[in-house]
């Protein structure tokens, strides 16, 4: 439903002339297909939060709500990037520095919210040794790099054809496993 709609609205990707010739055949591949992932994330997360609130009360849901907000805000950065590409009728949206700055702001707000709600501390558990290492303020620097690195991992793996669903499933399974 979404891909045909994007094609009819001519929301296709422009291809730069600097790459291999076969890339030109991918011109017109719909952009903003990430909206489907954002919608799926929103629906499943909302259902999950509703179950957790019903079972444990609202106290246990703040981390989930903040993490959902993190995902949606990063999705919004991607949508904004695609809108810039579309409005300028070129393949270049936000500059990398602009996009990374927005991702840092989003991650920083997430970490601030998690810290203020008591969902994280500055301690890092070292497995197999069984000790906690208090990183202090450095914890947030490391966490910012980890969050933005994870956010960009799928983006960098996305090819010319925009078929990022396989990578997204792998990353989603990882996050599901880590969250439990």
At which residue positions do the language-model features occur?
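"…together with the soluble PPM/PP2C metallo-phosphatase catalytic core" -> "…together
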Residues: 1-180
């Amino acid at each position: 439903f979404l891909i045909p709609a994007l094609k009819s609205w001519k929301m296709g990707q422009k291809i730069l002339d600097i790459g291999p010739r076969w890339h030109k055949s991918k011109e017109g591949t719909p952009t903003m297909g990430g909206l489907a992932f954002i919608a799926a994330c929103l629906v499943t997360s909302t259902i999950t939060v509703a179950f957790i609130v019903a079972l444990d009360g609202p106290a246990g849901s703040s981390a989930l709500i903040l993490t959902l907000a993190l995902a949606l805000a990063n999705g919004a950065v991607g949508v904004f990037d695609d809108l810039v590409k579309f409005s300028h009728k070129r393949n270049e949206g936000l500059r990398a520095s602009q996009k990374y700055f927005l991702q840092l702001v989003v991650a920083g707000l997430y970490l601030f919210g998690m810290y203020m709600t008591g969902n994280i501390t500055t301690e890092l558990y070292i497995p197999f040794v069984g000790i906690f290492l208090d990183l202090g303020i450095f914890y947030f620097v490391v966490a910012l790099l980890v969050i933005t690195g994870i956010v960009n991992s799928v983006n960098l793996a996305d090819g010319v054809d925009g078929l990022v669903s396989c990578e997204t499933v792998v990353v989603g399974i990882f996050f599901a496993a880590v969250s439990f």
